[in-house]
Amino acid sequence: MTVQGVKFSGVGAATPRQCLTNAHLSALVDTSDEWIQSRTGIQERHVAAPDQRLVDLASEAAGAALQMAGLDPTAVDLIILATSTPDDLFGTACLVQTRIGAVNAVAFDLTAACSGFLFALVTAAQYLRTGAYRSALVVGGDILSRWVDWGDRRTCILFGDGAGAMVLQASDVDQLLSFELRSDGRLNEHLTLAFAGTPQTLGENLAIAQGGFAPITMNGREVYRFAVTQVPEVIEKALHRAGCTVEEIDWLVLHQANQRILDAVAERLGIPQEKVISNVGQCGNTSAASIPLALSKPIQQGHIQPGDLIATAGFGAGLTWGAALFRWQ
């Protein structure tokens, strides 16, 4: 089997029309715009309407990415949807496949929380590198507003909804220079969206648990400590594998958890703020969508140029984290 390279040829994004401001949240819980901004950098976030589904946002982002890449949907071989909030627990990727007309694509969901897009991107790249497929559509999307406790000011201020997508294609030159993925289930309790079942008796000495998922719970202090120590390490590991230095990085694109984490990671790596891409102020933490959402606008506006070296890192529940180093197009 011939090993081939990977190039990144299109990106797209989608957010709901509804905008939830800090002022809105101040009417729901004991908080304020100043309190939220000083701790997170978030000013507003978008939330899906009751009739809006993940497939809607994911398909919109996918369509924009395909258009940028100049790739017909029928030419897509693989679709990976990174999400923790599917419309259907059996999977939403196939719904996206049908919606966009990618009739020839294999489609499946991947769950790695806020690390999901990065894990999906690396997974898709391996399919292309082996020659099994020629093109892949990687989508990250979440509607976390479904699973937030809107009475818990520690979490309800953080999350927004959205989707982002990227097109990967086989290439003679490999633009994915390196990656480093990590997981540690011992830290799982710090960030969960767990099943909460109620026992139901089916017969004598026979019972099951039925129920749904409890709202998101998070130990913010531990997640912050984890992110600012582990994320710089995996970025440095990816740089070492690629034979690159921190100084060669043109753009740092992290999972948009909150501005304090972005600033702390950049400072630890010695990366100046002008190289750090952030949209957390306008979008909040959009989980698996955050990296492609953050990339979309600067690419469309021409700030990110072909050949630019991008260091990206995701981190989240699991706990999972990782980094990838790639050149745009």
UniProtKB/Swiss-Prot annotation:
Family per similarity comment: Belongs to the thiolase-like superfamily. FabH family.
Chain residue ranges for the region called ACP-binding: 256-260
Gene encoding the protein: fabH
Taxonomic classification: Bacteria, Bacillati, Cyanobacteriota, Cyanophyceae, Acaryochloridales
EC number: 2.3.1.180
Keyword presence, Cytoplasm: yes
Residues at the catalytic site: 114, 255, 285
Xref: InterPro entries: ACP_syn_III_C, ACP_syn_III_N, FabH, Thiolase-like
One GO cellular component, as annotated: cytoplasm
Compartments where located: Cytoplasm
Subunit structure: Homodimer.
Name by which UniProt lists this protein: Beta-ketoacyl-[acyl-carrier-protein] synthase III
HAMAP family registered for this protein in UniProt: FabH
Biological process per Gene Ontology, one example term: fatty acid biosynthetic process
Catalytically driven reaction(s): malonyl-[ACP] + acetyl-CoA + H(+) = 3-oxobutanoyl-[ACP] + CO2 + CoA
Keywords: Acyltransferase, Cytoplasm, Fatty acid biosynthesis, Fatty acid metabolism, Lipid biosynthesis, Lipid metabolism, Multifunctional enzyme, Transferase
Top-level class of the enzyme under EC nomenclature: transferase
Pathway noted in the entry: Lipid metabolism; fatty acid biosynthesis
Record function comment: Catalyzes the condensation reaction of fatty acid synthesis by the addition to an acyl acceptor of two carbons from malonyl-ACP. Catalyzes the first condensation reaction which initiates fatty acid synthesis and may therefore play a role in governing the total rate of fatty acid production. Possesses both acetoacetyl-ACP synthase and acetyl transacylase activities. Its substrate specificity determines the biosynthesis of branched-chain and/or straight-chain of fatty acids.
